[in-house]
Amino acid sequence: MNGGPSGFNNAPVTKAFVIATALFTVFFGIRGGSSKLGLSYQDIFEKFRIWKLIISAFAFSSTTQLLSGLYLLYFFRVFERQIGSNKYSVFIFFSGFVSLILETILLSLTKDPTANLLTSGPYALVFASFVPFFLDIPVTKRFGVLGVHFSDKSFIYLAGVQLLLSSWKRSIFTGICGIIAGSLYRLNIFGIRKAKFPEFMASLFSRFSLPSLSSHSQPPRRTSPNLGRQAVRAYRAPMPSTTEPSEEAIATLVSMGFDQNAARQALVHARNDVNAATNILLEAHSH
């Protein structure tokens, strides 16, 4: 398992979000106000500080949270490559909106105007992303340390646990809200997984994209030596496609942790349809 090609190739929305998170965190950290960015009952129900609602969705309250959060946001760019920048923008908006509603309900139940009950930072996006990470990203390597079994996904989970517990109850509450938001997106409530923003809005992020990286600079990933053959047996197209899979499609599947050769074979049988090829590989991996 890996995050795919290094950098933000084919992930301009993630790049914009990471930059905004870093800038807001550093700016308010220098001014000494980062610890006061967490939402409270007073912020929403008494003074209605709109600016704080926005800033709290980006700025972390500590350097430790920033490092863990940026690491996870950077890794989760794999999902933008998988579903496209437009739908990923919808995922970000939906996760943030649902999390804000849940946090507002939580604050309304406490009614404590003096305490910042919720910590600040993009917890909604980070922990909503753990839902597809848990369900869709396959384990490609297992190993043991002192009798304890780990996988290549364990480091991501450990970073998530560290971030979840970084401010104790304040961060646990926001993290749980993010997981619930990600679960609702996964359940396709209101058909949200098919929703898209107008193209002119999504294209605003294109200016943040980095120069594309050559796909053949990526070393082959190994999952299982028989995964490619399993993928072919798992799906038989009536008319084998003679179209060579695009390098971009192969890179997308490789970025999800699949072996390069298996990805190529799956794309051939799926007629270069990334979603269908993903299903083929996941089905083969489950056998």
Swiss-Prot record:
It comes from the Eukaryota. One of its GO terms (molecular function) is serine-type endopeptidase activity. It is found in: Membrane. The chain crosses the membrane at residues 10-30, 53-73, 90-110, 117-137, 145-165, 172-192. GO terms for cellular component: autophagosome; endoplasmic reticulum; membrane; phagophore. Signal peptide: none annotated. It is a multi-pass membrane protein. Keywords: Membrane, Transmembrane, Transmembrane helix. It holds the Pfam family Rhomboid. Residues 244-284 form the UBA domain. The keyword Nucleotide-binding does not apply. GO terms for biological process: heat acclimation. Probable rhomboid-type serine protease that catalyzes intramembrane proteolysis. Belongs to the peptidase S54 family. This is Rhomboid-like protein 18. It comes from Arabidopsis thaliana. The lineage of its organism: Eukaryota, Viridiplantae, Streptophyta, Embryophyta, Tracheophyta.
